[in-house]
C-alpha cells in the first residue's frame, strides 16, 4: 500500500481536507508525498457528475497560504472563465485530458495569443498578464501551478473590457468572440 495514494470517493480525512468555503468543489492534500493517478482523475469526473456538473479541483498543497500551489483541475465547457491577471504571479498549465484554449490579452483587451492545448501540452503565462481559459472539449482536466499564497478576492485582477458574467447576452457574445479565435 502506498502512503501517497489518495481517493476522492473513499474519502479519508487524514489524507484530504475538503474546502467548503471555496467557489468550486476543492480538496487539499494533507499528506506528503502525494500521487495523482488515472483513478483519481476518473474520480474527478465522478465527483463532478454527482454534483450536477460542478468544477472540481484537488490542491496538492495543504493550504491556501502555501508558497507554491499545484492543482489538478476539472473544468467544463459550459461555464464562463473571465479574463484576469495575477499581479506578481506567473502560472503554467499542463493538459492531462481533453483540450483547452488559452487566450492572452494586452491591457486593452486585444488578443495577443490564442492557442489550443492538447493532452500533454504545457503553456506558461508570465506574471501580470491578462489571460483566460476555455475548455474546448466538454471536460478538460489539467495541472496548474503558480506561486502562493492565495489572496482571495485580491488574487485576481479583472479588466473592465471583459464581461463579469452577470449579463447573459454580453457574456455569450464575448464567448462567441473568443470562440472565433479557436482553430
Name each region found by the language model:
Residues 1-68, 115, 161, 170-183:
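A short, N-terminal "cap"/entry segment at the start of jelly-roll beta-barrel domains
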Residues 82-83, 102-104, 123-125, 131-136, ...:
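Short beta-strand His + acidic residue motifs that chelate non-heme Fe in jelly-roll/DSBH
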Residues 106-128:
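Short acidic-glycine-tyrosine-enriched beta hairpin
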